[in-house]
Regions:
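Targeting-peptide/extracellular-domain and disordered-appendage signature
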Residues: 1-168
């Protein structure tokens, strides 16, 4: 609202603790899962950097991904769309020193990384991922730092990358 530069970051990762090896790995309850979620959230001003992270196993009330409507969440840190698509969406995170509630819109085409979205990570081609970006997101909403709320607007982007193996 005042023209001061501000950076906001929300990142979520999903890891498989171990690949399924057979019938013994079949979930018997929703607490038995190989999926672990980690999220980073940050706000940066010209003078300060605020950051936090959360971890959780995949469980319906703790962390996960919903397809319809689309939602990625870890506790109250959430990317939520009203449709099956990424946009329009809201991005929310709250921490002890900072928080944000942002509206995200985009109608631009996604940008595929690598060769048509297939991104080779090693010289021998054995390590690769699928990867796309959306670098043209309109952002507006509120950012709260140390109890003071600011109206914000600007531009953002998202990267989405997935692989069948751990990427270093």
């Amino acid at each position: 609202e005042e023209g001061n530069p501000l950076g906001v970051q929300g990142t979520q990762f999903r890891f498989a603790a171990a690949p399924p090896t057979g019938e013994d790995d079949v979930k018997k309850t929703e607490w038995q899962t190989q999926q672990v979620y980690m999220a980073h959230s940050a706000v940066t001003t010209t003078d300060n950097h605020y950051a936090d992270e959360k971890w959780s196993r995949a469980q319906a009330s703790l962390a996960g991904v919903d397809r319809s409507p689309f939602r990625v969440y870890l506790d109250d840190w959430q990317w939520t769309s009203s449709t099956n698509d990424l946009f329009p969406a809201t991005l929310n995170a709250n921490s002890e020193q900072f928080g944000y509630s942002l509206k995200l819109t985009s109608s631009a085409p996604y940008q595929k990384q690598g060769e048509q979205g297939y991104s080779t990570k090693s010289a021998d081609g054995q390590v690769a991922s699928y990867y796309y970006s959306q670098p043209f997101i309109d952002v507006s909403g509120e950012v709260t730092i140390d109890g003071e709320t600011h109206q914000v607007s600007g531009e953002g982007w998202i990267d989405r990358e997935w692989s069948s193996q751990f990427l270093l």
